[in-house]
Amino acid sequence: MADKGSVAAKSLTNSAPLSIFSYCAASILMTVTNKYAVSGVDFNFNFFLLAVQGIVCITLISSLKQLNVITFREFNKVEAKKWFPIAVLLVVMIYTSSKALQYLSIPIYTIFKNLTIILIAYGEVIWFGGRVTNLALGSFVLMVLSSAVASYGDSNVDTGKLNFNIGYFWMFTNCFSSAAFVLFMRKRIKLTNFKDFDTMYYNNLLSIPILLFASLTTEDWSAKNIAQNFPEDTKYAVIASMIISGMSAVGISYTSAWCVRVTSSTTYSMVGALNKLPIALSGLLFFKAPINFYSISSIFIGFAAGLVYAIAKQKQKKEDELQLPTDKS
């Protein structure tokens, strides 16, 4: 019986469909729970929300390490000092992300998030000697087009123009801060040789004090404001969504590594592109996101853009691999 159980467990851990489904489910769960947490009337505890998520994340991965499920490096003051600027960028990125998600619908947020890819691509050209192929450029055009169509669709719906203008400001700020975070982290990872869970551990551990300090000094901790952010009828649901979103962040990291291990980087990149569609549609399903010709069209254009970009990156990777033997000869 024990042998049968171990065989069944091994079969599950090597299941490509299960790994793909788990990755998609974790991504959707995190987006939806984040949106729910910040969707309260006049919610203004963004720093506290992010601190709770970080604490949950650290608690969970530390527990998993104790159970020998995952491994990551022990805390090192020298490495922490070098990594601290990355943690500051992370705080800016996740704060602007939570503010954008607070004011924008999930489909709009997901579509505009694609613009970060363009900034990262050209950042890699400048700092890492990367290149942008014609196919990748075509995907960028589709990304910009999907964002323009989504914005036009939003402006034609009477849902509070001021809020959406503020949301776009936070969204563009998030795109630039996300690109900066990814590019600087990539450079630092090359120097430190950090693995996925090393990165998650240091990012969360170093950002928690910053987030708690920002929350205590800039957010209103009066009894009236706490009651406003955590109404009696939804208080426990909001707290649960904070905890679940922190857990799903760990889930995304774990399922990403799992997906790459049992499939391939090509399949993983395709899944990442295809996953944009269910995430955007979840906003239409669970929240009152505007539904019209333009909003639906923008989702599918953004979906196509992600797919074209994934294909472009894989094609570029194959071309680079074919050129390597030539360079050596």
UniProtKB/Swiss-Prot annotation:
The chain crosses the membrane at residues 12-32, 41-61, 84-104, 108-128, 132-152, 164-184, 197-217, 238-258, 267-287, 291-311. Keywords: Cytoplasmic vesicle, Endoplasmic reticulum, Golgi apparatus, Membrane, Sugar transport, Transmembrane, Transmembrane helix, Transport. GO terms for biological process: transmembrane transport. It comes from the Eukaryota. Its main location: Golgi. Residues 1-11, 62-83, 129-131, 185-196, 259-266, 312-329 are cytoplasmic. GO terms for cellular component: cytoplasmic vesicle membrane; endoplasmic reticulum membrane; Golgi membrane. Disulfide bonds: none annotated. It is a multi-pass membrane protein. Homooligomer. Involved in the import of GDP-mannose from the cytoplasm into the Golgi lumen. This is GDP-mannose transporter. It comes from Komagataella pastoris. The gene is VIG4.
